[in-house]
UniProtKB/Swiss-Prot annotation:
<keyword id="KW-0396">Initiation factor</keyword>
<comment type="subunit">
    <text>Component of the eukaryotic translation initiation factor 3 (eIF-3) complex.</text>
</comment>
<dbReference type="GO" id="GO:0003743">
    <property type="term" value="F:translation initiation factor activity"/>
</dbReference>
<keyword id="KW-0963">Cytoplasm</keyword>
<dbReference type="GO" id="GO:0001732">
    <property type="term" value="P:formation of cytoplasmic translation initiation complex"/>
</dbReference>
<dbReference type="GO" id="GO:0005852">
    <property type="term" value="C:eukaryotic translation initiation factor 3 complex"/>
</dbReference>
<protein>
    <recommendedName>
        <fullName>Eukaryotic translation initiation factor 3 subunit L</fullName>
    </recommendedName>
</protein>
<dbReference type="InterPro" id="IPR019382">
    <property type="entry name" value="eIF3l"/>
</dbReference>
<feature type="domain" description="PCI">
    <location>
        <begin position="257"/>
        <end position="452"/>
    </location>
</feature>
<comment type="function">
    <text>Component of the eukaryotic translation initiation factor 3 (eIF-3) complex, which is involved in protein synthesis of a specialized repertoire of mRNAs and, together with other initiation factors, stimulates binding of mRNA and methionyl-tRNAi to the 40S ribosome. The eIF-3 complex specifically targets and initiates translation of a subset of mRNAs involved in cell proliferation.</text>
</comment>
<dbReference type="Pfam" id="PF10255">
    <property type="entry name" value="Paf67"/>
</dbReference>
<comment type="similarity">
    <text>Belongs to the eIF-3 subunit L family.</text>
</comment>
<keyword id="KW-0648">Protein biosynthesis</keyword>
<dbReference type="GO" id="GO:0016282">
    <property type="term" value="C:eukaryotic 43S preinitiation complex"/>
</dbReference>
<dbReference type="InterPro" id="IPR000717">
    <property type="entry name" value="PCI_dom"/>
</dbReference>
<dbReference type="GO" id="GO:0033290">
    <property type="term" value="C:eukaryotic 48S preinitiation complex"/>
</dbReference>
Amino acid sequence: MSYEERANAHPNLNDESDVEEEALVNDYREQVNFDDGMSELDRTTSLGAASQTQDLQAQLAAAATPLEYQATLETKFASYDNYCSLFHYILNSDGPVELEVPSYYWAWDVIDEFIYQFESFCRYRNRVARSGSNEEEAQLLRENPNTWGCYSVLNVLYSLIQRSQINEQLAAMKRGEDPLAFAGEYGSRPLYKMLGYFSIIGLLRVHCLLGDFSLALKTLDDIEMNKKAMFARVMAAHFTTYYYVGFSYMMMRRYGDAIRMFSHILVYVSRTKNFQKGGNSYDAIAKKNDQMYALIAICVALHPTRLDDTIHSALREKYGEQLNRLQHGGPEALPLFEELFRSACPKFISPTPPDFDNPSVNIDPVDHHTAIFMDEVKNTLYNPTIRSYLKLYTTMDLKKLAGFLEVEPEKLRSWLLVNKQRSRQVRWVEGGLLEGEPVNANDLDYALEKDLIHVSETKAGRRLVDWYLRNLARVY
């Protein structure tokens, strides 16, 4: 079955509301227009004359400033010490720190840069240990195993969340109650509230980098994935959240949910592209945008479904021939799956320091997770070919199909069982991101009775009325 035929047979029941998309676009336009007349200096001045406040302000500004790409190891150590001092002061002072935050952008920048430096340091340390070429740096890293340690970073993020009572505040908002009643002494301060909130997004990112995808999604239990969420006000945070949620779904084989997440943010980005140009995060967003198109190509190949017209056109433009190869399956598609996955996956990290004395035992975390993903792809490699034969019959002998495919009958039986199991996916409906209902992801179903295959096919017609309404709303 061609991509277009499958697309017509699988209407997307989870299309985002165009009204909500328009509201997000308008909100982002207002943010950009407002920020155009406000320099970074304007945002961070007039915060008080007290020297202590000014010192803290300077530390926060430094914490939000990206580290130089070619920074030395000593500079990375010093940056870690500065973050420790800053967060220790914020979390362990006698009472809440009195400081008015300039905007929610600032809190995101601090958490984002903190995690980025942690991630880049872990990858750098792993490269030094695996290469074994720079003994001086290896010795320095060996003597400081806790610098940028996984436990320290997670401890900071969880402490900021706990101190701000942000999860309790978000849960109260979902129940329609006053969040200030649950904020406490610290959570009522914007400084703690903003840092706590974006620490939740930071935890999503860190757990995903560590390969714990279910825990990554669990951290967002109290955050609603809609335009009212605070992260949607910051473009980089908005993009980051949907990227890591979508990727976590993909690694959990919930391809339908992954496609829904990727599609939402890609449509939003396509409609705000003109407002992003010239922004500090434009290049990073453009790169992540390309990565998500690669991931959505993988998901659509493994789980054919109907896409938004904008996404469909862009996907065909970027990966036309490659997408056809992915969908046809077979051994020749394996290198392409791996190439796209490596180019689009997060830069995974290890939770523990490497073994500097035995470089050969250190494994690249990206290689590790790529191997896990490719094992899953290999399990479904012949599904398109098998489906193309089964669609021609209502009953078919197992040995006959094995002859067509030139494989042993028992090997074919295992393929059919794997395909049957993979066709049952959990799809999110409401509640937490980990929740969902089991659904049959394919329009083709079958049952094995000894060596006889019983085939049934269901086709859902396109919802033309909905299609016309969506496109009329865009035109008018």
